[in-house]
């Protein structure tokens, strides 16, 4: 069981007397229940990129500096009542009863995922308004922050600069698998022409219109479109206009997971990886044999640094 304060990044030196230390801004409560994020302003004079990372369940915002011209944003989840902990309010992006058996009481996740997705999209849009191109914005998170940010990213309509997830999972992955598997089963039988068909080479105008309708229906029922559509429907977000290409799936992604993780089982990380591959995503996957529920130091930090450097063509500090 993941207790309510185990999955955080390293903490900065924050106190009420010391609201800003080394470019890190302390959070304050705002009206919608969220706190202002901890923000690490760029060390360099120019602000060229932004990275937004979500903490794990029961934790709060961190300190994590690698790239001098990059602004780091560490949001803190609002307090939500956790059914698993006798409805005790804890910082969590969404409620969940059993991480390793997500189909049990899965409805608990929906409201939080809806709010968190809207919140993260708002942070992204604010950075775009601040002049940062969307292709220079990276999102991600640790543990439940990985799960929430992954779900939110897949519901976004634009390609991002990158995604970084550590020891997390994909909420409602089983339904995504079902969408993709249903299409595979259809592909296995669609070549069987049980009605024989016609040998006529000419098509009537009606037949051509019917073929066009079939093509449009294929786009509408594309398994990838349907899988992403399910995620949006699940949280009452509008579906994107029907088209063959879903821009956000072009986002390069990094996923890392400890093989010995007992809080978020390794197989859940593998499941997320496989679903994302099924969606056509570009995945950098790292498994850490001797790691539990955390991130690997220095290996995983180095891997993330290299991934961000390659994806955004950024030079990292040593």
Question: Where do the language-model regions lie?
Answer:
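Alpha/beta-hydrolase-fold catalytic nucleophile elbow
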Residues: 75-76, 164-167, 256
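Serine-hydrolase catalytic machinery in alpha/beta-hydrolase-like enzymes
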Residues: 4-24, 29-136
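Conserved alpha/beta-hydrolase "nucleophile elbow" surrounding the catalytic nucleophile
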Residues: 55-57, 137-143, 258
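Primarily recognizes the serine-hydrolase "nucleophile elbow" in alpha/beta-hydrolase
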Residues: 128-192
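A generic structural signal for alpha->beta connector loops
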Residues: 67-69, 136, 160, 250, ...
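The feature captures the conserved acid-bearing segment of alpha/beta-hydrolase catalytic domains
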Residues: 42-45, 168-316
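Conserved beta-strand scaffold positions in the cores of enzyme catalytic domains, especially
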Residues: 72-74, 163, 285-287
């Amino acid at each position: 069981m993941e207790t309510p304060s185990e999955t955080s990044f390293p903490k900065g030196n924050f106190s009420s007397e010391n609201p800003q230390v080394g470019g890190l801004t302390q959070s304050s409560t705002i009206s919608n229940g969220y706190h202002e994020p901890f923000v690490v302003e760029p060390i360099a004079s120019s602000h060229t990129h932004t990275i937004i990372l979500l903490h794990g369940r029961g934790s709060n915002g961190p300190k994590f500096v690698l790239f001098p011209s990059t602004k780091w944003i560490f949001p803190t989840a609002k307090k939500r009542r956790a059914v698993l902990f006798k409805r005790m309010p804890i910082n969590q992006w969404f409620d969940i009863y059993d991480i390793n058996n997500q189909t049990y009481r899965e409805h608990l996740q929906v409201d939080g995922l809806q709010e968190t997705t809207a919140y993260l999209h708002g942070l992204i849009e604010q950075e775009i308004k601040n002049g940062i191109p969307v292709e220079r914005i990276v999102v991600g998170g640790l543990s439940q922050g990985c799960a929430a940010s992954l779900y939110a990213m897949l519901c976004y309509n634009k390609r991002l600069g990158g995604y970084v997830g550590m020891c997390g999972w994909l909420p409602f992955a089983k339904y995504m698998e079902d969408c993709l598997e249903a299409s595979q089963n259809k592909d296995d039988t669609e070549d069987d022409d049980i009605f024989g068909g016609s040998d006529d080479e000419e098509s009537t105008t009606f037949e051509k219109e019917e073929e066009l309708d079939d093509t449009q229906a294929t786009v509408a029922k594309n398994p990838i479109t349907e899988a992403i559509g399910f995620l949006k429907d699940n949280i009452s977000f509008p579906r994107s206009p029907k088209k063959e290409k879903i821009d956000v799936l072009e986002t390069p992604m990094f996923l890392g997971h400890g093989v010995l993780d007992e809080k978020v089982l390794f197989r859940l990380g593998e499941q997320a990886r496989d679903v994302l591959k099924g969606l056509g995503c570009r995945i950098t996957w790292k498994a850490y044999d001797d790691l539990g529920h955390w991130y690997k130091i220095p290996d995983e930090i180095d891997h993330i640094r290299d991934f961000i450097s390659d994806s955004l063509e950024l030079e990292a500090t040593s």
